[in-house]
């Protein structure tokens, strides 16, 4: 397995990995780098069966999540609800068979942001099954963004002094078929509070935020006044999605990405071929570890 560092300084690329025969050293790197560096892109070139992909994901996580409150149709059969279809493909009744099947934009978000740390999966793993070329998924780096945010001179009144006390409440329902705010809801997001500034399993500190699910800001148990809600949301959305904190992954079939779901968001620009594109998605958990000794800054830069 060969590791290279993206020119942006944080995304790790993986080449020359036999995903059907991952050794213990490779597995350890695939389990830790998505937390220290937030995104790992494996440029796999061999097609996988669902059993092979299921086996791969079971190896890079301690456990896989299987309790998403969604319709049966989105789960890949015989995977214990651990593998989900992400596609706009329709069945014989005209119903979309996977998550997020609309051709228009899928806004910046992370999955089920209101769930507690004990329940919520740490990371997602996506595999490009077919017809992915031309599709883009964007990812963010809130570790670096938080460092810069603390030094910002143009932040709205009260935001910076409240950062470490800030909580977000998510009370969200939305359709995984036809867009986040569609009326035909087939998925009920679970509600709850989470810290705005938090840590992932590696000990890295960053920002946990998901603007698609309409978060409400609280300081402790006190809601931020309406004017502050609006100003803070607008400022943070623009700040956290600046190009310097974003990576646009241009999909090719058979590639695999693993992305931290505590300190990173993802989004998908409009894609007209969504009815043919198919991704498989797994979400999982790892045990806490000390990521401070992991230094990818010495890796060769990817050309």
Say what each PLM segment does:
Residues 2-39, 44-253, 262-303:
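Non-heme Fe(II) oxygenase catalytic core, chiefly the N-lobe of the double-stranded beta-helix
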């Amino acid at each position: 397995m060969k590791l290279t560092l993206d020119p942006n300084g944080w995304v790790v690329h993986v080449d020359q990995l036999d995903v059907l025969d991952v050794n213990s050293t490779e597995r350890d790197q695939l389990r830790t780098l998505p937390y220290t560096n937030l995104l790992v892109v494996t440029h796999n070139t061999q097609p996988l069966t669902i059993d092979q992909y299921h086996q791969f994901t079971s190896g890079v996580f301690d456990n896989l999540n299987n309790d998403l409150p969604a319709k049966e149709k989105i789960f890949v059969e015989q995977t214990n609800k651990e593998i989900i279809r992400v596609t706009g493909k329709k069945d014989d009744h005209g119903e979309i068979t996977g998550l997020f099947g609309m051709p228009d934009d899928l806004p910046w978000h992370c999955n089920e942001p209101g769930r507690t740390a004990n329940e919520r999966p740490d990371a997602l793993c996506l595999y490009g099954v077919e017809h992915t070329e031309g599709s883009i998924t964007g990812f963010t780096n809130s570790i670096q963004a938080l460092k810069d945010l603390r030094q910002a001179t143009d932040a709205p009144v009260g935001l910076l002094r409240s950062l470490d006390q800030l909580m977000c409440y998510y009370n969200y329902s939305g359709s995984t078929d036809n867009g986040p705010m569609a009326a035909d809801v087939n998925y009920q997001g679970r509600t709850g509070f989470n810290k705005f500034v938090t840590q992932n399993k590696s000990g890295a500190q960053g920002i946990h935020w998901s603007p698609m699910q309409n978060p409400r800001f609280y300081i402790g148990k006190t809601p931020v006044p309406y004017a502050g809600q609006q100003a803070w949301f607008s400022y943070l959305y623009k700040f956290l999605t600046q190009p310097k904190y974003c990576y646009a992954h241009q999909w090719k079939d058979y590639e695999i990405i693993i992305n931290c779901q505590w300190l990173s968001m993802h989004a998908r620009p409009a894609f007209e071929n969504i009815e043919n594109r198919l991704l498989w998605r797994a979400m999982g958990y790892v045990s806490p570890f000390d990521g401070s000794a992991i230094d990818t800054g010495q890796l060769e830069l990817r050309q």
